[in-house]
């Protein structure tokens, strides 16, 4: 009679919530990995953010009317490929990454901050870690797959218990059976394998699963005998099969869905037997009941989604709203939201239905790793989901001990924007969350002691740990100056300068722009003479060869260095009144490079010192007074993308097409002082010193052509970047324009129109996003003007020039009312006098060092806001409601009557009719 069995889930319906119940305004990543990208415990949700190596963390349940906030945890230096919560500890998270390591994290409980470092690190492996999963019965055991290798780890000892036999190709899935005795794997060689890792490393069984080698996944049912696999057939159709390990030669049942290229993720609840099939890039969920006894995959219901699915996860059964007959809850990850989709059986919602909610495995492990490896097969004790039987025993793993909570009076805040909260009845109801808005540290490297341009003493760091770090420039806005300041009608602009060049250069007096004409002509435009340029030909500098880069001397605003394809550097002197005629003879010509020149950079402190890089793979340091190269740096294996002087002028950093970042001490020797891994992409890169010379910022591309920013500790390049920030996929190179002691803007280059703004910190969270903005048209280049050009009275933070477009000025919004009357010394610290040299070329070459002078930007008639008297808070009179609440009903009644009597009173004033004038007696007739 089993074939006529009526399923108790036959009327199950999926209930997508209203948009108010979505976890909205998140930034999910679109990683190439075929994993789920989102996981949930009974307290937390974690997902892949749009930044490689960074996870978003949010409570499963909102607290009251407050908006839930997303915290960001920097886990790895590369993409997080897979993640999993411990089945026993809601706050123990394992992450695997393309950086070839597995890390275990203790996520924050009440009053705790995000971890600054992982509790356990496993690996590194030979290839990126693709799969990982915790053991279902023992705490501290997990399985991971990297390439063709599958390992079973004892996390406490940080050593593998065993390494399974190598597979024939990339392992796509590795999962534990429900009893924890077996491991099932799916491989790109189209084979399914069953392992008993405690018996032998070889597979005990294997069979061909799906005819297509595309992504294949496994999910075990509630018993060790049966599991489900998903994959593709020869027609590239999604395929689902039910297997019995006792009859492994063929599938018990199978079904075919639609044609798609996205991975089909099986979300199987072993207690109910409900299977949700979620296809990446699709807008539909399929729900089936797995019935091994028939055997069959019985359809239950389908759910149409409002947004494209990027990932999916099941919420643990202990977090379901059992009194509402919620038998399953799926979390859909889209680009900008997490949507909870509950599956409900239409029954009375005031009773607990034991047939729908059988006892499930509890959160106390049945055994330890040593006992399990010795053969112990005890199962976790089951617990009832009936609310009347709660609470259940809890467990905290000793793998990563919890930290001490902060005092109850101080709750830490989150680093990101609030996300839309969910109604308690709309699918996110769960036990109270333990995430209390942590700050955002990162484990990508050692933390430093202070920030870039903003003092972070102990008091400020303590405040940030309580309130969450946020940039004071987060409300900055980009504003186009009035058209009267524009320089327009510029014709013949050269749009084909090499990728190593910024395209144009500027100082406080003039702009130099290469033109698309023969002879390497350079136009020099006076900033003090804005307006429309004449239609006639402009006076130019005749360089004689195509321009590859150009730079103004920071200590001589009339001297311009121009590099050409003929491997020569020409120094031009522009008359003080401006360029009025064509100049054909440069002041000096520097020769020495063997091939065309890539970049030019003047020394920040010493006069007449210039660095140049060339396609001959060398960097030369020139003495402009003598007109010769005095130093030559070597060690590059490919094209040099960019170079930059350190703020103290003692070191020079380069980023190269060979994927390496190098730091030199030019006066010490020609070989690099240290090297480290750089961007993997070979399309272009930039490098700049930040955070007072303690860090290096590199912009470039990863292997997937995604543009990214990498932050390095300058003294530890070999350890890799402290943090990696992924932005978007675009062909143009990001050109970082850094404002010392403030914050950088990283504008897109050549054909882009967006400008990204970040404040940089040498410690976690490293990148603090500000208010990015988009220009109305694409720009060719982007240059910062000296700080002295800013209007500090109007709180103008930076002034920039855009090539082929009007000048730009950056203004903050949301300034205090005193911003226009007091000098904002917290926003405008003393700036370096970058237009006056500290050393001569000869002194620097002989080993002398110096520091720039500092200049206050405070106008003489303005007082600093830090010294402005603070207004005392106005006393608020108690409200009438509060006043009345303190009195009894009888007192209120008496006071009301007295007030009425006092208002009316016993007045003896004449009545209105007494003032009327009557008529004479004879008028009555």
From Swiss-Prot:
SMART domains: DUF1899, DUF1900, WD40. Residues 429-460, 866-882 have a biased composition (Low complexity). SUPFAM superfamilies: WD40 repeat-like (SSF50978). Residues 884-896 have a biased composition (Basic and acidic residues). InterPro entries: Coronin (IPR015505), DUF1899 (IPR015048), G-protein_beta_WD-40_rep (IPR020472), WD40/YVTN_repeat-like_dom_sf (IPR015943), WD40_repeat_CS (IPR019775), WD40_repeat_dom_sf (IPR036322), WD40_rpt (IPR001680). The membrane-associated form is phosphorylated on tyrosine residues. Ubiquitinated via 'Lys-33'-linked ubiquitin chains by the BCR(KLHL20) E3 ubiquitin ligase complex: 'Lys-33'-linked ubiquitination promotes interaction with EPS15 and facilitates actin polymerization at the trans-Golgi network, thereby facilitating post-Golgi trafficking. Deubiquitinated by ZRANB1/TRABID. The modification Phosphoserine is found at residues 462, 465, 915. Residues 196-216, 399-465, 857-925 are annotated as: Disordered. Residues 201-210 have a biased composition (Polar residues). Belongs to the WD repeat coronin family. One of its GO terms (biological process) is actin filament polymerization. It comes from Pongo abelii (Sumatran orangutan). This is Coronin-7. F-actin regulator involved in anterograde Golgi to endosome transport: upon ubiquitination via 'Lys-33'-linked ubiquitin chains by the BCR(KLHL20) E3 ubiquitin ligase complex, interacts with EPS15 and localizes to the trans-Golgi network, where it promotes actin polymerization, thereby facilitating post-Golgi trafficking. May play a role in the maintenance of the Golgi apparatus morphology. Keywords: Actin-binding, Cytoplasm, Cytoplasmic vesicle, Golgi apparatus, Isopeptide bond, Membrane, Phosphoprotein, Protein transport, Repeat, Transport, Ubl conjugation, WD repeat. Disulfide bonds: none annotated. There is a cross-link at residues 472, 680 (Glycyl lysine isopeptide (Lys-Gly) (interchain with G-Cter in ubiquitin)). The keyword Transit peptide does not apply. The gene is CORO7. It is found in: Golgi apparatus membrane; Golgi apparatus, trans-Golgi network; Cytoplasmic vesicle; Cytoplasm, Cytosol.
């Amino acid at each position: 009679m089993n074939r006529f069995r009526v399923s108790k889930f036959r009327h199950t319906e999926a209930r997508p919530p209203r948009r108010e119940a979505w976890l909205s305004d998140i930034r999910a990543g679109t990683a190439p990995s075929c994993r789920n990208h989102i996981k949930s415990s009974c307290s937390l949700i974690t997902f892949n953010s749009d930044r490689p190596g960074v996870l978003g963390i949010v409570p499963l349940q909102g607290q009251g009317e407050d908006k839930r906030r997303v915290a960001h945890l920097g886990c790895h230096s590369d993409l997080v490929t897979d993640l999993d919560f411990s089945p026993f500890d809601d706050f123990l998270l394992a992450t695997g990454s393309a950086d070839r390591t597995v890390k275990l994290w203790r996520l924050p409980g009440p009053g705790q901050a995000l971890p600054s470092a992982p509790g356990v690190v496993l690996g590194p492996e030979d290839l990126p870690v693709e799969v990982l999963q915790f053991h279902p019965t023992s705490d501290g055991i997990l399985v991971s797959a990297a390439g063709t290798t599958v390992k079973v780890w004892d996390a406490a000892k940080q050593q593998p218990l065993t390494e399974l036999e190598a597979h024939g190709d990339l392992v796509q899935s590795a999962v534990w059976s429900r009893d924890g005795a077996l491991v099932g794997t799916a491989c790109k060689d189209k084979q399914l394998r069953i392992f008993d890792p405690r018996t032998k490393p070889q597979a005990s069984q294997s069979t061909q699963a799906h005819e297509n080698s595309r992504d294949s996944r496994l999910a075990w049912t509630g018993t060790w005998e049966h599991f489900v696999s998903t994959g593709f057939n020869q027609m590239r159709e999604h395929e689902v099969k039910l297997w019995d390990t006792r009859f492994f030669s063929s599938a018990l049942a199978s079904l075919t869905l639609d044609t798609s290229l996205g991975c089909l993720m099986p979300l199987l609840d072993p207690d109910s037997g409900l299977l949700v099939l979620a296809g990446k890039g699709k807008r539909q969920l399929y729900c089936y009941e797995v019935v091994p006894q028939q055997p069959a995959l019985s359809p239950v219901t389908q759910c149409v989604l409002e947004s494209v699915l990027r990932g999916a996860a099941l919420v643990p059964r202990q977090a379901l709203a059992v009194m509402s007959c919620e038998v399953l809850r799926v979390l859909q990850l889209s680009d900008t939201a997490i949507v909870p989709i509950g599956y409900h059986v239409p029954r009375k919602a005031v009773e607990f239905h034991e047939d729908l909610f059988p006892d499930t495995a509890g959160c106390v492990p049945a055994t330890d790793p040593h006992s399990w490896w010795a053969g112990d097969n005890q199962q976790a004790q089951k617990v009832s989901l009936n609310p009347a039987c709660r609470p259940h025993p809890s467990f905290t793993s000793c793998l990563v001990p919890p930290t001490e909570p902060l005092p109850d009076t101080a709750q830490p805040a989150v680093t990101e924007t609030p996300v839309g909260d969910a109604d308690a009845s709309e699918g996110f109801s769960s036990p109270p969350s333990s995430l209390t808005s942590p700050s955002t540290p990162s484990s990508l490297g050692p933390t430093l002691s202070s920030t870039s341009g903003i003092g972070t003493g102990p008091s400020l760091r303590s405040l940030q740990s309580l309130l969450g770090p946020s940039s004071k420039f987060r409300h900055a806005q980009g504003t186009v100056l009035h058209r009267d300041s524009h320089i327009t009608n510029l014709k013949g602009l050269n749009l084909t300068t090499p990728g190593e060049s910024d395209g144009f250069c500027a100082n406080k007096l003039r702009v130099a722009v290469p033109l698309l004409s023969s002879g390497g002509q350079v136009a020099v435009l006076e900033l003090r003479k804005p307006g429309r340029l004449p239609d006639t030909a402009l006076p130019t500098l005749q360089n004689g060869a195509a321009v590859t880069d150009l730079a103004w001397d920071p200590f001589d605003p009339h001297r311009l260095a121009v590099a050409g394809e003929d491997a020569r550097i020409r120094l031009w002197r522009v008359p003080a009144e401006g360029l009025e005629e064509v100049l054909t003879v440069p002041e000096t010509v520097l020769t020495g490079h063997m091939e065309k020149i890539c970049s030019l950079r003047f020394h920040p402190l010493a006069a007449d010192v210039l660095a140049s890089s060339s396609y001959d793979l060398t960097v030369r340091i020139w003495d402009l007074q003598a007109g010769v190269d005095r130093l030559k740096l070597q060690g590059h294996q490919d094209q040099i993308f960019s170079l930059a002087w350190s703020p103290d002028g003692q070191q020079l950093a380069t980023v190269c097409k060979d994927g390496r970042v190098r730091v030199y001490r030019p006066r010490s020797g020609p070989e690099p002082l240290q090297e480290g891994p750089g961007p993997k992409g070979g399309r272009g890169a930039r490098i700049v010193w930040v955070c007072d010379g303690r860090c290096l910022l590199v912009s470039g591309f990863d292997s997937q052509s995604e543009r990214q920013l990498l932050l390095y500790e300058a003294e530890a390049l070999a350890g890799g970047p402290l943090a990696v920030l992924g932005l978007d996929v675009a062909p143009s190179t990001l050109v970082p324009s850094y404002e010392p002691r403030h914050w950088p803007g990283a504008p897109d280059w050549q054909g882009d129109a967006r400008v990204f703004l970040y404040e940089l910190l040498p410690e976690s969270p490293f990148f603090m996003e500000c208010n990015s903005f988009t220009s109305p048209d694409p720009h060719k280049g982007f240059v910062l003007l000296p700080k002295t050009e800013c209007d500090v009275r109007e709180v103008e933070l930076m002034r920039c020039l855009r090539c082929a477009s009007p000048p730009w000025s950056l203004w903050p919004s949301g300034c205090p009312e005193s911003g226009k009357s007091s000098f904002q010394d917290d926003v405008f610290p003393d700036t370096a006098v970058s237009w006056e040299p500290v050393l001569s070329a000869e002194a620097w070459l002989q080993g002398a060092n110096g520091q720039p002078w500092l200049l206050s930007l405070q106008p003489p008639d303005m007082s600093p806001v830090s010294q402005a008297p603070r207004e005392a808070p106005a006393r608020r009179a108690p409200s009438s409601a509060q006043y009345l609440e303190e009195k009894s009903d009888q007192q209120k009644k008496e006071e009301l009557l007295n007030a009425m009597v006092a208002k009316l009173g016993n007045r003896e004033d004449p009545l209105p009719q007494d003032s009327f004038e009557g008529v004479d007696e004879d008028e009555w007739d």
